[in-house]
C-alpha cells in the first residue's frame, strides 16, 4: 500500500510495484548461476516447462490447491486420481494414488515448502508408498527420489495466465540419480 496515488504511480513507473520481488528473482537466478560455476558434469540444470492458459491466474492457482480441481486433471491421460488427501500449507502434504485402467496404483506425494498465493508454490515432489513415505519410480528405480519443484503463475494478459513448472535435483541426489535426471 502506498501513502498516495502519486507515490504508487512513481513506483509503477520505476518498475518496482511488487517491492523487492523482482530483485529477489534476479538474485535467485544470479546466485544459481554463480553456484553452478565449476560444478561437475553430474550437476544437472533444471527442467522447465511453461504454458499459457486462457484463464485467470487466481483460478489456475486454485486448480493446484484443491482436490476438487486436481482430481480432474492431475496425472497422465487415462489415469484416475484416487485416495487424495491435501494439507495445503507450508509443511503440509498432498498424498495421492494414480490408478491405471487395469487397477494398479502408483502413489505420490508433495511436501509444500512455500506458498505465495496466487503466484508461487514450492514443494518437494516424490513417488511414495501408501503410508506417504518416500518411494521410487516404479518403472525407473534410478529416477531421483525427490525433486525440488517450483510452480509459478504469472498474469500475462487480461484473463490469461502463464504457468511455469521447474524441477531441480535436491542437494542429496546420488550420482546415479543426477545422471538419470
Please place each PLM-identified region on the residue numbering.
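Hydrophobic pocket/interface hotspot
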Residues: 20, 27, 60, 64, ...
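Hydrophobic ligand-binding cavity/cleft-lining segments
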Residues: 37-81
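Glycine-rich portal/gate segments that line the openings of hydrophobic small-molecule binding cavities
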Residues: 82-136
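A short, structured loop/turn motif at beta-sheet edges
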Residues: 57-58, 87-89, 113-121, 152-162
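Beta-strand/loop substructures that line and gate deep hydrophobic ligand-binding cavities in soluble
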Residues: 1-21, 122-125, 132-180
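Intrinsic-disorder/low-complexity, polar/charged segments enriched in Ser/Thr/Lys/Arg/Asp/Glu/Gln
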Residues: 44-50, 57, 93, 107, ...
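A generic structural micro-feature
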Residues: 41-43, 88, 102-106, 140-145, ...
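Hydrophobic/aromatic beta-strand elements that line small-molecule binding cavities or substrate pockets
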Residues: 1, 51, 83-86, 108-114, ...
Amino acid at each position: 500500500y502506498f501513502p498516495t496515488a502519486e507515490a504508487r504511480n512513481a513506483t509503477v513507473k520505476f518498475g518496482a510495484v511488487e517491492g523487492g520481488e523482482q530483485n529477489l528473482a534476479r538474485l535467485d537466478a544470479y546466485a544459481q548461476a554463480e553456484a553452478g560455476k565449476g560444478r561437475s558434469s553430474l550437476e544437472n540444470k533444471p527442467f522447465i516447462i511453461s504454458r499459457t492458459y486462457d484463464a485467470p491466474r487466481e483460478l489456475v492457482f486454485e486448480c493446484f490447491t484443491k482436490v476438487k480441481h486436481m482430481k480432474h486433471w492431475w496425472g497422465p491421460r487415462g489415469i484416475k486420481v484416487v485416495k487424495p488427501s491435501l494439507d495445503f500449507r507450508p509443511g503440509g502434504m498432498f498424498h495421492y494414488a494414480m490408478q491405471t485402467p487395469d487397477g494398479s496404483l502408483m502413489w505420490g506425494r508433495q511436501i509444500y515448502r512455500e506458498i505465495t498465493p496466487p503466484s508461487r508454490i514450492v514443494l518437494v515432489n516424490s513417488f511414495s508408498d501408501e503410508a506417504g513415505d518416500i518411494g521410487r519410480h516404479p518403472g525407473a528405480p534410478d529416477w531421483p527420489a525427490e525433486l525440488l519443484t517450483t510452480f509459478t503463475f504469472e498474469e500475462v494478459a487480461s484473463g490469461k495466465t502463464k504457468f511455469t513448472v521447474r524441477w531441480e535435483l535436491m542437494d542429496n541426489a546420488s550420482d546415479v540419480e543426477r545422471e538419470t535426471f
